[in-house]
């Protein structure tokens, strides 16, 4: 049973909430925190914060109590919205008793928040704000603490100019195939504090019109997606992998290949797959937040789903390059620079540098890091790559991810991990091996892999590893493939909130076993 708010109801509630916030006597440009899974109140609170002239500071809803306490202090947060979370019992004990809180209505399956002003009780005290704050483009819009794959989160300061400039992309290029008359259905399920969800889903919907639906829970995601059939769908590579493996679990690859060769049947199969995924009406399907293997893009293309590959980060408001899913020539790139973006490569380090109106003002209360990242107007992305003769950008890895073997050779993990993209028996692969003579690969099995007899699986993976190694220079050859026991999740900190592998945490979890694995004569091992 879906509950609906009209645009008028949403605007009325946001204006009342803005009036309430202004009545609290907060300092000018006060920092207002938000911690909640995606829901309508999140959007309304975000709008109200802007209308009141304050700065939003959203947090990942998966934060632990100590992490949130640190960010509330460091981010100088004056008031906190608490909503759809499952961890209030542990978080609440870390927040001072007198800290101002406004709590969203309780959602099924979430912990009851027992402190602060209740949402409707607070809002209904006020009349709608007549004259919302109108910011200057140079004003600070938001501070987003990145999840990061190493170290403490950094508070990225984005101005209204950065947000406003994103309209250039939609209006001039329209990679999302947005209908400017407002016929757009969006689904929101990736964390709203993540820059892509906020810009691509929330603000594109607000700017150009449409409806925005929220997934109830992870368990209901697949059904909700089928119900909504959005016009625009964005997913991290891990979600695309889940979709792919789900299809192959029902229709094995050989059978699928055969069916796709039959003209009439091929069209029916593609139509059915899209419907079952929830992508029948999708005008654009986009991947981002982490690298997607070219083999996966090509696989989806064969079943009629054309994935646009986008490259960006919080520091540039998710705007840098993109390659359309129908651009067959450059599937292994992340595309050409977007309108208003300049990209170049540092000749010494091969680091990707970019500039444009979308770039952050800096890192909150971290002048040293700001100066190291923003140099003469150029954002140093931390990614390594190159531009081809047609100005298409290719990402080869992270500057900080490179590691040196005991032979003194540097390894770029991402370039090796991409070789495993066609192996459907594996769900996730991480190349590592600092200090070993050769790199090793850690992997977790997919449901397809788990269904195979152990000896058959080992034999198959030994063949695949040998095939991969024939394409590699000697120093890059992978000595061992280890199938890990524990599932990699956000809970055990191997994956971040945006489903990227946190390599530092992988090192912490497994590094003591590296030497033994490498010295084992077998090339495919199960972790004991």
PLM regions: where:
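Conserved AMP-binding/adenylate-forming core of the ANL superfamily
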Residues: 1-39, 43, 47, 64-69, ...
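Conserved AMP-binding A3 loop
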Residues: 4-8, 141-167
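Structural core segment of the AMP-binding/adenylate-forming
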Residues: 24, 51-121, 447
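ANL superfamily adenylate-forming
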Residues: 86-137, 247-276
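Conserved pre-ATP/AMP-binding loop-to-beta segment of ANL
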Residues: 124-145, 152, 178-185
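Conserved AMP-binding/adenylation subdomain of ANL enzymes
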Residues: 164-188, 192-272, 281, 306
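Conserved ATP-binding/catalytic segment of the ANL
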Residues: 337-339, 344-346, 351-405, 422, ...
């Amino acid at each position: 049973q879906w509950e609906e708010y009209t645009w008028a109801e949403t605007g009325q509630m946001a204006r009342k909430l803005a009036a309430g916030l202004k009545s609290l006597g907060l300092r000018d440009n006060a920092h207002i925190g938000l911690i909640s899974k995606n829901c309508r109140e999140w959007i309304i609170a975000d709008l109200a914060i802007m209308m009141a002239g304050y700065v939003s500071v959203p947090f990942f809803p998966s934060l632990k109590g100590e992490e949130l306490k640190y960010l509330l202090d460091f981010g100088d947060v004056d008031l906190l919205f608490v909503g759809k979370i499952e961890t209030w019992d542990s978080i609440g004990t870390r927040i001072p008793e007198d800290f101002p809180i406004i709590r969203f209505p309780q959602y099924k399956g979430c912990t009851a928040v027992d402190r602060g002003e209740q949402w409707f009780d607070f809002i209904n005290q006020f009349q709608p704000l007549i004259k919302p704050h109108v910011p200057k483009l140079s004003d600070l819009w938001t501070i987003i603490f990145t999840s990061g794959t190493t170290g403490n989160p950094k508070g990225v300061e984005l101005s209204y100019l950065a947000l406003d400039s994103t309209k250039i992309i939609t209006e001039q290029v329209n990679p999302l195939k947005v209908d400017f008359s407002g016929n757009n259905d969006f689904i929101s399920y990736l964390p709203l504090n993540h820059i892509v969800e906020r810009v691509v889903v929330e603000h594109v919907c607000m700017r150009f019109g449409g409806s925005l639906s929220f997934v109830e829970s992870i368990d209901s995601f697949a059904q909700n997606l089928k119900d909504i059939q959005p016009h625009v769908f964005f997913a991290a590579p891990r979600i695309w992998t889940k979709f792919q493996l789900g299809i192959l679990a029902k229709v094995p690859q050989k059978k699928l290949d055969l069916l796709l060769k039959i003209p009439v049947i091929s069209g029916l199969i593609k139509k059915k797959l899209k419907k079952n995924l929830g992508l029948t009406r999708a005008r654009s399907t986009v991947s981002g937040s982490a690298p997607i293997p070219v083999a996966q893009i090509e696989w989806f293309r064969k079943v009629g789903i054309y994935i646009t590959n986008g490259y960006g980060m919080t520091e540039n408001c998710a705007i840098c390059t993109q390659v359309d899913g129908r651009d067959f020539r450059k599937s292994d790139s992340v595309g050409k620079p977007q309108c208003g973006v300049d990209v170049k490569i540092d000749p010494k380090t091969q680091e990707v540098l970019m500039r444009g109106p979308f770039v952050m003002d800096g890192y909150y209360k971290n002048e040293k890091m700001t100066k190291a990242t923003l140099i003469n107007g150029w954002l140093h992305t931390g990614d390594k790559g190159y531009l081809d003769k047609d100005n298409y950008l290719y990402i080869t890895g992270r500057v900080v991810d490179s590691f040196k073997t005991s032979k003194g050779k540097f390894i770029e993990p991402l370039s090796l991990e991409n070789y495993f993209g066609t192996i459907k028996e594996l769900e996730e692969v991480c190349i590592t091996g600092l200090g070993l003579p050769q790199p090793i690969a850690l992997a977790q099995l997919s449901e397809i892999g788990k269904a195979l007899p152990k000896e058959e699986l080992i034999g198959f993976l030994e063949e695949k590893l040998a095939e991969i190694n024939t394409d590699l220079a000697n120093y890059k050859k992978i000595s061992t493939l280890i199938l890990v026991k524990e599932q990699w999740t956000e809970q055990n900190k191997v994956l971040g909130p945006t489903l990227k592998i946190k390599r530092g945490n992988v090192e912490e979890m497994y590094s003591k076993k590296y030497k033994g694995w490498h010295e084992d004569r077998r090339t495919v091992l199960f972790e004991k």
